[in-house]
Amino acid sequence: MEFSIAVLCYRAEEEIIPFVENLHKIMSLFRFEWELILVANFWQGSNDRTPEICQQLAKRLPYVRVLAEPKQGAMGWDMRRGLDACRGKYIGVIDGDGQFPVEAIFSCFAKIKSDDFDLVKTYRVQRRDSLYRRLISTVYNWLFHVLFRGSGKLRDVNSKPKIMRREAYAKMMLQSDDWFTDAEIILSCIKLNLRMYEIPIEFHSLGGRKSFVKPSAILQFLKHMLEYQFRSRSSVRKAN
């Protein structure tokens, strides 16, 4: 298996159908073995129809697998479960809400294949989402650059798709179950001296769908960043 990409489908329901169909059409242009992993994990007791819809997609589209498990965490848990399920030499992740252009997968994959990078991701140069989302992203990236050395050249921590070599992912000890997982991937690359590259993209609006990013997100991000710093410093002291 050359390439696997996990699609985060949480509570997308019918809205995931055109995204997956378009992504599948683009992936079909690849002349090697590939797969899509539809991550449709769900909270027990919810009426979320996403797992059922993803299973229907997998029945009619080849090279599509579905991961539908009772959730034990938030977005980060889904991302880790999806990446763990990927079988390719190169693995990646993208949100299934349609805000990130699926064509960016081609650009990222071509770059990581042609050059000696361990991770290739995107950064958003033109955003069509809300002022609220843009403000949160700006503040978060600024805090990230202030708190973590070596991150200054990175423009956009949370942007996707993220595509990496399988052996690079195997070295990462990701723990976060929520929105901090994107940051953990970047921090792992910095800590492990892995080579990263960013490609510019246009970021689309959510349309009528409500964002899952709450106003408290910045405080949660800051809390996680400080906790990560504390753990890192504690491990250094123990090593010495």
Question: Residues of each region from the PLM?
Answer:
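Acceptor/aglycone-binding surface of glycosyltransferases and processive sugar-polymer synthases
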Residues: 63, 67-85, 90, 102-179, ...
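Hydrophobic helical membrane-anchoring modules
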Residues: 1-3, 8, 22-29, 151, ...
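Acidic metal-phosphate-binding loop of nucleotide-sugar-dependent transferases
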Residues: 43, 73, 98-100
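Active-site beta-to-alpha loop of glycosyltransferases that engages the nucleotide-sugar donor
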Residues: 7-21, 42-45
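A structural alpha-helix within SAM-dependent methyltransferase catalytic domains
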Residues: 20, 24, 55, 83, ...
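Acidic donor-binding segment of Leloir-type glycosyltransferases
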Residues: 23-67
